[in-house]
Amino acid sequence: MRTPSARYTALIASIFATTLAAGVAAQNPAPDSAGRGATRADQAPSREAGTAIGSAERKFMTEAAMGGIVEVEGGQLAAKKAMMPEVKAFGQRMVQDHGKANEELKRIASGKGVQLPAQLDRKHRGDLDRLAKLSGADFDREYMEHMVKDHKQDIAEFQKAAKDLKDADVKQFASSKLPTLEEHLRMAEQAAAATKDRSAKR
């Protein structure tokens, strides 16, 4: 047997090394940048998952929360300052019903990542401060006139929300509160009429 030349031996070694390197590369492929990006995108949890909500829903919840705070604080004022039993009872009902609705709305908003107002804005605070300066029949009449106007507006907004909004939870909230708002309006109209009758008899 002839001894292979040094050149032939070097060639064989080179082929073997190349083949071995190719095998290792096949077993451990280097991830390309697109692959790495796709993996991270697939594995990263979406912050919006389960919390995404439209601007219309966000606007409705924010305004409903502010309106609810107005009703509760106005009701507390009426329960304390009203002269007529009908007005005092109406104020107490506002505290009870809108207080519960406010808590329900907070839970819905929290689950969707929406921050609701926790206190009155300057405009509504000013309205209640002016109302608080009244007393007796003047307070009763002014408060009930505001309540009739507010509940008519609330009903229109909640009807629109129940019809047009896309989010099922917010839509259901609006729809479920309509019967109570309509009852409040009937009560407000009756109490407002009573305050006018009393004023007419003075």
Name each region found by the language model.
Residues 2-12, 22-202:
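His/Met- and acidic-residue-enriched segments that coordinate or traffic transition-metal cofactors
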